[in-house]
Every structure is written in structure tokens, then in C-alpha cells.
């Protein structure tokens, strides 16, 4: 059955990468194939934590999409877009850097999917006002979100999985990974001009933006206050996850329910931002990856890679980092990390007498988080961003994303390798 699972996954992946077939249709067809053959059962799909649909991701997306849909009715995105454009004096590069910094910071405190859902509408409005292409801005922001999410325990789902298995705390992530994330973020900003080239804006467009009054963009101040109060509660619950142990998906759904109750909006108004295609694509992708996990393909690949190290902790850390990045770029990093954590735990236990035994855990988290930038389906935030871009009339192809993402991933992993080497194997001794 492993051959069948691999064949279906590779065929689906090739079709998705070709950009010639609707990716949601491909994902659902591939999912149907692994069920019919049968490689995976309905119980595996709906109830298994390891091989099933990640309902936490699905419901987090639904909740945050509804919250964004309600928030859009207030005009706050227009306000933020005008404010950002005016503070940057209409310079596309300065606007991009500002939005990149906001995306990275927000992803460290929330999660990168939520960040993309909140920042993307602002980006679309800024680009519309200046009459410039949105694709460069959206890609830069999702790169920053995946990088920023590595900084904290709650920033990226793989970090939560690693922390749970390794017994690491919120403060551990802040102490060990945040310094590297700052370095990688600076490197990302430095390569932005080379990555996306120069973006020109017509002078009259800049003059028009500078003449705008952002205060006039707010259409419903009462609803904005209600949204602000709910968002504060939602964000606080996200940050307090290590203490409250309330799943982010439940928090998002509760927040969405509260806003629906107090907003007075119609069903079509608050559901207008729900990306149904994106949700179905995720479901299909989770099912196909679940088939790879169930048949032992991912486990066999990971075990073969880690056995090459011969028990040396330095080699183990670098191999985990190097293997995690490309694999996380090909399959979603959540099921990959869920599969790898038992193996890393076993390796750490065997090497217990060696110094820096937590380093393989940091290598796994960094490889999975940074590797998410490699391809368009490497991280949940990427898929969400592509869906938003498509609906906005500015679709981003799989290969366009991958060409840029490969550069960002290579720089990030190179800096991560240097950081791990210096901090844990040179300066520590």
C-alpha cells in the first residue's frame, strides 16, 4: 500500500505544481483515491490524530475568516492601508518592509495563518490605492510570517508539537529561537529588493494617497469597538495557550460566534471571507499525507535519515535541520513534525550523556518552520495566502512562489545552521 500512497501523492503533487488543474479538485481526487483503494479508512480520516484531517487547523481557519469578514465591514483595513502608505510616503519598498515587520511580529504572538488572514486585506488595499502589483507584497508577508512564527511556542503549530513532546516552555523558545529569528528577518529585509526588484509608483498616485484622510475610512465605529474587544480576548487566549490549554481553533470559533451575535450582520456578510476552496484543499491534502503516514513512508524516510548520523549529536542536529526543510516544503510541516517527534525523542534519549541534547529539537522546529517557505504548500499560511491572491484577481503560480521561496529558505537554513553551530557547539564549550 505504501507504493500506492506514494504514487497518488506524487501524481497529485505534479498536477498541483503544474498550475494547469484546479488544486482543490486534485487534492480531493487524490484523497478519494486513497480511500477507495483503500489505503486509508474513514476512521483514520476523521478520528486519527496522526493520519486524519487536522480539525484544529480547519476550524481555526473558519473562525478567523469569519472574524476578518466582520472586521472588514468596519473599514479598519482601509484605515490601516492609508495610514501605512502615508507613513511610508508612498514608497513601495518602505511599505513592504513595514508590512513584513508587522507580519513577523504578529506571527510570533499569534500564529502565521491568523496573521496572513489579518494582514492580507490591508495589503490588497494598499496596492490598490497605489496601483501596484500585490503578488510581491503577499509573498514577502507570508515569508515573514513563517519566519516570525518560529520565534515562540505559539507562533507555528510545529512548535506546539515539539514543545509538548520535548517538555519545552514558552520561555525556552523565546530564549533559544527568538535571537535567530531576528537575524533571519533582517536578512529577509536585506534581500527583498533583489528578490522582487524595483516597484515604481506613479507620482499622482502617491499625491492622491498622501491627500487621503484615513479617519474617513472608518464606516462603523461601534462595530469596530466590538471587534476590537473580541480580538483582544482572542489574542490574549492565543498567547495564554500554554497556561489555559484552550485550543486556538476553539478560541477562534468562540470569537467568531461572539462577533456574529453582536454585529447584526447578515449571513452573507460575515461568511463572505470564508475561503471554502482553501478549506477543501487542506482537507484533501491532510488525507493524502495521512496515507503516507499510515503506510509508514514518512516514518521510514525519517528513520533512514537519522540512522546516518551514527549517534553523533552534531551530525544529528544538522541532518535533522537539512532533512526537515525540504520535506516540510513538500508536505505540510504539521504531519511531518508529528511523525518526527518520536524519533527525535528516541535519539535524544540515546544521546543523553552528550551536551546540548536539546539541539535536535531546535533543529527540528527550525527546519520545519523555515522549510515551510520552500513551496506554495509547505505551510498552511502559504495555501491561505494563495487563495486570497486568487480571489483578489492576482493569482500566484506554484513555481513563482517556489522560485522566491527557495531563496528565502536557503538563506534561512544557512543562518540557522551557523547559529546552531556557534551557540551550541562552539560558544557553549
From Swiss-Prot:
Keyword Transferase tagged: no
Topology term for the membrane: Multi-pass membrane protein
Transmembrane segments: 26-46, 51-71, 99-119, 135-155, 173-193, 223-243, 278-298, 311-331, 361-381, 407-427
One cellular-component annotation, GO: plasma membrane
Family annotation (CDD domains): P_permease
Highest taxon of source: Bacteria
GO-annotated molecular function: arsenite transmembrane transporter activity
UniProt main location, coarse: membrane
PANTHER family registered for this protein in UniProt: P PROTEIN
Name this polypeptide is given: Uncharacterized transporter MT2758
Organism: Mycobacterium tuberculosis (strain CDC 1551 / Oshkosh)
Lineage: Bacteria, Bacillati, Actinomycetota, Actinomycetes, Mycobacteriales
Amino acid at each position: 500500500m505504501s507504493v500506492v500512497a506514494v504514487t497518488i501523492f506524487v501524481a497529485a503533487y505534479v498536477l498541483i505544481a503544474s498550475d494547469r488543474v484546479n488544486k482543490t479538485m486534485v487534492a480531493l481526487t487524490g484523497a478519494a483515491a486513497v480511500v477507495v483503494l483503500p489505503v486509508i479508512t474513514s476512521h483514520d480520516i476523521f478520528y486519527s490524530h496522526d493520519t486524519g484531517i487536522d480539525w484544529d487547523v480547519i476550524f481555526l481557519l473558519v473562525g478567523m475568516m469569519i472574524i476578518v469578514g466582520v472586521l472588514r465591514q468596519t473599514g479598519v483595513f482601509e484605515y490601516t492601508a492609508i495610514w501605512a502608505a502615508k507613513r511610508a510616503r508612498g514608497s513601495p519598498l518602505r511599505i513592504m518592509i513595514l508590512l513584513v515587520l508587522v507580519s513577523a511580529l504578529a506571527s510570533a504572538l499569534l500564529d502565521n495563518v491568523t496573521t496572513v488572514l489579518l494582514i492580507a486585506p490591508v495589503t490588497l488595499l494598499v496596492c490598490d490605492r497605489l496601483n501596484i502589483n500585490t503578488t510581491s507584497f503577499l509573498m514577502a508577508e507570508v515569508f515573514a510570517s513563517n519566519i516570525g512564527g518560529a520565534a515562540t511556542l505559539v507562533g507555528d503549530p510545529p512548535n506546539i508539537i515539539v514543545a509538548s513532546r520535548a517538555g519545552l516552555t514558552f520561555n525556552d523558545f523565546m530564549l533559544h529561537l527568538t535571537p535567530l529569528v531576528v537575524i533571519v528577518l533582517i536578512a529577509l529585509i536585506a534581500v527583498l529588493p533583489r528578490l522582487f526588484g524595483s516597484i515604481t509608483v506613479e507620482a499622482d498616485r502617491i499625491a492622491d494617497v498622501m491627500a487621503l484622510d484615513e479617519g474617513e475610512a472608518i464606516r462603523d465605529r461601534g462595530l469596530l469597538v466590538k471587534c476590537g474587544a473580541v480580538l483582544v480576548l482572542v489574542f490574549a487566549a492565543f498567547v495564554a495557550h500554554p497556561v489555559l490549554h484552550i485550543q486556538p481553533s476553539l478560541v477562534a470559533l468562540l470569537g467568531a460566534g461572539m462577533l456574529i451575535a453582536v454585529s447584526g450582520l447578515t449571513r452573507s456578510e460575515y461568511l463572505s471571507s470564508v475561503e471554502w476552496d482553501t478549506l477543501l484543499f487542506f482537507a484533501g491534502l491532510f488525507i493524502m499525507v495521512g496515507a503516507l503516514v499510515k503506510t509508514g513512508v514518512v516514518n521510514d524516510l525519517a528513520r533512514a535519515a537519522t540512522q546516518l548520523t551514527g549517534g553523533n549529536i552534531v551530525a544529528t542536529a544538522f541532518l535533522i535541520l537539512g532533512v526537515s526543510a525540504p520535506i516540510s516544503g513538500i508536505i505540510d510541516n504539521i504531519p511531518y513534525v508529528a511523525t518526527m517527534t518520536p524519533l527525535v525523542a528516541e535519539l535524544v534519549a540515546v544521546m543523553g550523556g552528550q551536551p546540548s541534547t536539546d539541539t535536535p529539537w531546535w533543529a527540528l522546529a527550525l527546519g520545519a518552520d523555515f522549510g515551510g517557505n520552500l513551496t506554495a504548500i509547505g505551510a498552511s499560511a502559504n495555501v491561505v495566502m494563495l487563495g486570497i491572491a486568487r480571489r483578489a484577481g492576482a493569482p500566484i503560480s506554484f513555481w513563482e512562489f517556489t522560485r522566491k521561496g527557495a531563496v528565502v529558505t536557503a538563506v534561512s537554513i544557512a543562518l540557522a545552521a551557523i547559529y546552531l553551530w556557534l551557540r551550541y557547539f562552539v560558544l557553549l564549550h
